[in-house]
Amino acid sequence: MKIGIIDSGIGGLDLLNKIINKYPNNEYLYLCDNLNVPYGIKTKKEVEKYIVNILNYLEKKHINLLIVACNTMSCFMDKLKSLYSYPIYTILDYNVKILNEKYQYDKVAIIATSLTIRSEMYLYKTNNIDIQFINGSYLTKLIEEDDETLIDKEINSLIKQINKDNKAILLGCTHYGLYKNNFISKCYSKIFVEGSKELIYDLPLKNFESKHKLEIYLTKYNKEYISLIKKHLNYNFIIHNITL
């Protein structure tokens, strides 16, 4: 099978690692719109345009299914899903599923980008959950820039904003998952919620006899960025530079 995975940047690499680990013998296409990253500080109109261009491109690549690893991109998928021939799975829907199943009537902190928060999709899709939203857009930017010192400081800053009575924390941007251990080490008394396991479980995938193939598609070729991908990705890949 040919599986597409999309993200505004490197955030989806954590999910990609987990999927390949579970189903190694498939063909994977990871499209990273690093020309326009970060999405979380853009307007809805800008991001919707980027997403439509990406989905149209993937239609031509004849993928069998698409996984939207980016929470901000996920916010636009409900109205776009029916326009394409391939099924679309979003990380946001699986985060919501876990919240609704396990945390009704609880207080939960969601750290997410500005646009994800402004979309109000987590409010719209969750039931009877008291959500504290914390804007982590700056952290997304720092992770893309690979500034480890400032990343650590910003994680500390975000954790200080979490209300003490929150039972759980959802890292509502896949970039933050790359530094989940940093969050846990600084906030070990909280439960960390994530829907990636359920998403992977639901995928209609199996392991074929052929070896896996992984291709990374960048919208801006950059040697330093390729090095950043190698830092977070556990598998060898072929790189492509594309224009959408």
Model segments located where?
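Non-catalytic structural scaffold of enzyme domains
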Residues: M1-L244
